[in-house]
Amino acid sequence: MVLESFSASLRETIRKITGSSYIDKETVKEISKDLQRILLKADVNVKTVLQVTKEMERRALEEKPPAGMAHQDYMVRIIYEELLKILGEPSNVKLKPQTIMLVGLYGNGKTTTAGKLARFFAKKGLNSGLIAADVHRYAAYDQLKQIASEVNAKFYGDQSEKDPVRLIKHGLEQLKDVAVKIIDTSGRDSMDAELFDEIRRIKEAVAPDEVLMIIDATMGQQAGPEAKAFNDAIGVTGIIITKMDGTAKGGGALSAVAEIHVPIYFIGTGEHMDDLEVFDPKKFLSRLLGLGDLESLFETVQEADITEEEAQESFEKLMTGKFNLKDMYDVWEKFSKPGLMKKLVDALPLARIPGSQKIDDSKIQSAEDKLRMYRIIMDSMTFEELENPEIINAKRITRIARGAGVREEDVRMLLKEFKAMKNNMKMMKGNRGLKKMLQANFRSGNFGLEDLGIKE
């Protein structure tokens, strides 16, 4: 998960608040100190940390909760709103034909991000073309060409051309029928006049619709000065922060960049080409705090290619007890795509579920491995057995295990867990209040936030 330790600490603070019997001055001071420690550990600027916690304390002690809202929930709302202020404004990613110019220093993930952008726009129905305009790093051509093939994007490059302006103009002409043209420009090991002069020349000659700067999240609060230097020198329209999954300093990078008032368009959340996320401060913060993000939850389901009709049919089967192993197999197959289960877990409102614990990446990986094994086991079953698992006897368990290359205990565990799931669904079916609550929350699209008076 992005900012895993940061998120875990924030969620623990939320649980501490919601688990308190009352909120007094001592509790507010204690929560303030917790927040200061968490934010400083994430490399957020000291001045920013003090501003956030001072305002949080003032509001928690002076403001009265709206009618019908518990003081504990109102304090969570205050924390949400104060943290939101340091994350900047929502980006405005345009889903239309355009030319995008990527700039930034070496090692920040600029070339990889070019491929991720192409994959992102392809999902939105816009084909892309990648232009290799880094005329100084020899390996950049081959790297971008390989990435273009991986994401099924068109590619243009010319290793013999050393003038980036001529190269890009020719590339744009070659890719004129492509909706989104993405230019991977040269970087440097450090900011210098030569780099800025080259980027200015390209920008003036090409007039791109977007100039997006790529920044490494591991820089923490130092990302702010770097973004400011680029913006002052060439004028950037947006920021993409990479490697958010591999550092504890991502919070510092986000808050520092937000201070220069250049919108953050995307964040890189992993190594896969699909691991690029439009940055929406509200959704991002909601997940960090464990308040849930049903919009991302629905997007994940869409990414798994599950239609609304299929989802409704599966839900009805669950509620009526008609859900069988074949239905389970179909759902698991949809979610077998790398990274989907992780996205699903990140979107759940875990901090608002009593007794819930942090789900780290190792547990998610273990669950994915288990589901993969279960699918192999089900591949060794007959259609009749998938439709009616109750007919599977001890002799068949032995043959299924042998055919799947697993232990008999693994087959029994699958059948046991399936039976337990059906029993749980039967119990929920009889609880009208619980069923109504779940249906209402899923319709609202604000599970977790609505109870706090926070509107999307």
Curated annotation (Swiss-Prot):
* GO terms assigned for molecular function: 7S RNA binding; GTP binding; GTPase activity
Spell out the InterPro entries in the cross-references: P-loop_NTPase, Signal_recog_part_SRP54_M_sf, Signal_recog_particl_SRP54_hlx, Signal_recog_particle_SRP54_M, SRP/SRP_N, SRP54, SRP54_GTPase_dom, SRP54_N_sf
Pfam families attached here? SRP54 (PF00448), SRP54_N (PF02881), SRP_SPB (PF02978)
The protein's Enzyme Commission number = 3.6.5.4
What keywords appear on the UniProt entry? Cytoplasm, GTP-binding, Hydrolase, Nucleotide-binding, Ribonucleoprotein, RNA-binding, Signal recognition particle
Binding, GTP: 104-111, 184-188, 242-245
GO cellular component terms, alphabetically, are: signal recognition particle
Cited Gene3D superfamilies: P-loop containing nucleotide triphosphate hydrolases, Signal recognition particle SRP54, nucleotide-binding domain, Signal recognition particle, SRP54 subunit, M-domain
Q: Does the keyword Membrane apply?
A: no
Reaction(s) catalysed by this chain, per the record, are: GTP + H2O = GDP + phosphate + H(+)
Subcellular localization: Cytoplasm
Domain-level remarks: Composed of three domains: the N-terminal N domain, which is responsible for interactions with the ribosome, the central G domain, which binds GTP, and the C-terminal M domain, which binds the RNA and the signal sequence of the RNC.
Q: Which family does it belong to?
A: Belongs to the GTP-binding SRP family. SRP54 subfamily.
- How is this protein named in the record? Signal recognition particle 54 kDa protein
Which species expresses this protein natively? Thermoplasma acidophilum (strain ATCC 25905 / DSM 1728 / JCM 9062 / NBRC 15155 / AMRC-C165)
Lineage, broadest ranks: Archaea, Methanobacteriati, Thermoplasmatota, Thermoplasmata, Thermoplasmatales
Q: Which gene encodes it?
A: srp54
